[in-house]
């Protein structure tokens, strides 16, 4: 699975991660737009929600394993994992602590920017 990766520098690996995250978001948008054209916005939204509902737990399990987070890692563990999500790698974001709450905010969203450009 890692063939070719050994030849890359750390900087190239980081760039590849960013490219891959952007590609995943672009793929998500492409299939969404295709479904939207054929079936309408409501159906596309329904399928998008269903796909992300299935994907996010898998992504969380992989990040939890990578970071060696405990089952009850709390908001601190979440704050450690959120920056490594594919959507985080593809967008600009910030994490804020407000009282006892963790706020994760996408500050520059590739998907929303693309939709705004298209009108």
Please state what every model-predicted region is.
Residues 1-103, 108-119:
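N-terminal accessory segment detector
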């Amino acid at each position: 699975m890692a063939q070719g990766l050994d030849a890359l520098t750390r900087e190239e690996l980081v760039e590849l991660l960013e490219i891959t995250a952007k590609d995943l978001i672009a793929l998500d948008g492409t299939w969404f737009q295709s479904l939207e054209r054929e079936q309408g916005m409501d159906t596309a939204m329904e399928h998008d929600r269903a796909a992300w509902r299935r994907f996010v737990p898998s992504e969380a399990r992989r990040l939890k394993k990578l970071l060696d987070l405990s089952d009850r890692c709390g908001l601190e563990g979440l704050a450690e994992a959120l920056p490594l999500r594919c959507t985080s790698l593809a967008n600009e974001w910030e994490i804020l602590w407000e009282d006892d709450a963790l706020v994760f905010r996408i500050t520059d969203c590739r998907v929303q920017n693309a939709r705004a450009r298209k009108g």
